[in-house]
Amino acid sequence: MPRLLLAAPFLLVLHAAAQAPEDNRPPLFFREDWKEIAAVAPVTQEHVGNPALLLGLYGPGKDGVRKSHHDTPKDDPYYIWLGSCPANCAIALRDKDAFVDLTGLAKIRWRTKQTGFRSVRLTLKLGDGTWLVSDYAEGPSVDWHESEFSIAGIRWRRMDIKTIVEGPWVASPDLSQVDEIGWTELAPGGGTPASSRVDWIEVYGRPVARR
């Protein structure tokens, strides 16, 4: 019995350590969930819910980037829809005061719904102005789908921000100062049958002050 009594505090410490979150995971850098105001195309800064973020629209089809919502079903969210882009388009968000370090255990969480054969891909603008597009793609689903993925496992291609077309592979890009984060289909919108929808996005990374 004395041995058990002596061991009890040690076991409690081990249990507490096991329950504590790891201290090396980056914090939530930003979340965007769009204001619940009337749908519009193209989406404007007025529809951005996070006051720290600035909106950017890109590509020859950028005027078709729509903030959408329907009265039915009743749980239909306010979301970004690329289905009305007449040509390739992309959307991105940037923090007014900070870059974000997406190295290490940085990750993205988002709630999306794609139809047809469409997939939505992550886009990044680096501190030096380079644009990248991910090999990771969130594909179609029958309903809204929440997913999470690590940045470290992604391969990247350069992206032409004027045309929203992928270029050559970029080996080991420096993701320690990312300026803008967004997404694209790398294709014109296909209307309701073939398009992407993003309800909200969360970026987990460490802030880096803008000089």
Model feature map: region roles:
Residues L6-H15:
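Bacterial N-terminal signal peptides
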Residues Q19-R211:
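Beta-rich carbohydrate-recognition modules and glycan-binding surfaces
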Residues M1-L4:
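Positively charged n-region of N-terminal signal peptides that target proteins for export
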